[in-house]
Structures are given as structure tokens and as C-alpha cells.
Amino acid sequence: QAPDQQPGFRSNPWWVMVQEHAVEKEFEANDWALERLKHGASGLLFYLYDHQYLPRILRDIDLRYIQLGLVVEGSGPEVMDALLHHAHNEILPLDQMNGFLNTDPVEIAARTGHWDESKMYDLGELSRLAPPKFKYMCVNANFYGACGASASTQLGLALAHIDFYLEAFGEVGLEQYWLALSAGTHMFEEMAKIRAMRLLWGRLLETYGLPQVHLEIYTETSIQHQSALDVETNLLRAASAAFGAITGGADALQIRPYTAVLGANDAEAERLALNQHYLFAYESF
């Protein structure tokens, strides 16, 4: 097995340092993105509600050098088509685009109580449209963590979630799987959880008789572990969660701002969250 198939290894030496933004006004989102990139973020995650605004959001951003994440409630193929048009207009080689388009039928059904079969057809269409390094088989197991699931419950539900897609799609899109987990403050438990997930992924592929491929794991520090009464201490909570995720081998990590529990957009809190990435990177050099 290649080293990145072993528990505790990520596909690249450094994790992707992600920051997120819910798009309300496209030009404000673009200003935010350029500012975050200026401060050193290597991954941008957008919650997107209208694919028509995508070129405005991505203006002056060179997608060859960052990981782009798009969380979509509407039509995934329409958003992917808009992204491909943007890449064509920017003369951007598709094989140099890195990121994911997140439209997860199972998580949407769990969150809303409504199963939409058309979302499964969207995944089939994305298998035709998506660039080779752009993930689209997304498993949002962080939703279960946000609902209060323990580490073992998160793993069990994530595995069932992946199994559903493997049963439906088989080897189609096998290299395009992307898993989101939430990270709590028990750092050793988080290390073990991510490493165990890689072992379970390998065992599941073996059971289906499928080739061993790398599973992209994205982790975000949990808001459920933040305090609304003493928000500054959330920096310490985030540090414990992030340390566990990084040491466990997460490919990408979002450290949530210490004010996230208040639902506030705070530029200073975002800056400090990004600085925590730098501290971990510096200390592990």
C-alpha cells in the first residue's frame, strides 16, 4: 500500500487551511475571499445559492493554487457547468483545478426529512462533468457531529453513508469521494477517529472488491464545543480540536472563529483562526 493509504497519513505533506463564507452578495464574497487569500488561506469554502454569480465571486482568484469548495442546495450540475465556463473564460486547465462540489442527497434527507431522488441523478451527471481533481461524491458526516453524535457514532453513520453510495454507484466516481467530519476537543479521540475512518474505508473497499484509493477527509472544529458566555476560551477549545485533526491525518481543516457560536461574522476572529493554522504549521516544521 502507498503511504497515504495508511492511517495517519494525508495525501499531501501539509493540510489545506480552509475558511468559509455564506454568499449573500457576490461582490462582498469576492472581497472577503481576496482578503482571506492575502492572509494565507489555502482553501475557500462557499455556501452558494445562485450559480449565476459564480464568476463574480471568483474574480481575480487563481484556482490553480487553492482548494475551492462549493456547498450547493440547488442543482449541482448547473453549478459545475458554471464553474467550467468560468475556467474556460479564464483559460484555466481543468486538470489543475482542485476542490469539491458538495451536494449530498443523504445528508439533505437527514437534515430536511425529504428524500429527493433527482439529487442522485445529479451525482451521475457530475461524474460526467467534473474535472479529475474535483471531488463530487461528498459525505457530510459532520452533520451527525453537529447533532451531538459521539466519535464512534459519527464513524458508524459515515460508513453507512459511504456504503449507500458505493452500493448505488460502484466504481463510478471512486476517486472522487470526500468526507467531512467534525472535530471535538478530546484530541486523542479525534486522532483515533480519523485514523480509524481510513481503516474502515479500506475495509469497505476490500469488501466490495474495489481498488484501494485515497479518501479525502475534511475536518472542521465543532461549534457545539464552543462557549457563548466566555468566547475567548474558544480559541483553546479550537486548538485542541485542530491538533487532533491535524495529527490524525486530515487532508483539510477549518478552524472555526471563536465567535462562530454567536453567529457573528468577525474579521478579527477569522484572522486569529487562520493564525492558529500557522502556529501548528510552524511548530510541526
Segments predicted by a language model, with ranges:
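Catalytic alpha/beta active-site cores
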Residues: Q1-H186, E190, Y208-E216, I246, ...
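Short glycine/threonine-rich loop-to-helix capping motif typified by GTGT followed
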Residues: S150-L155, T185-A196, I223-L236, G263-A273
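Glycine-rich and small/hydrophobic secondary-structure elements
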Residues: A160-E167, V231-A250, L274-A281
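Histidine/acidic residue-rich metal-binding segments in metalloenzymes
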Residues: L200
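ATP-dependent phospho-/nucleotidyl transfer catalytic cores
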Residues: R203
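Active-site or pore-adjacent capping/gating segments
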Residues: S240, D251-F285
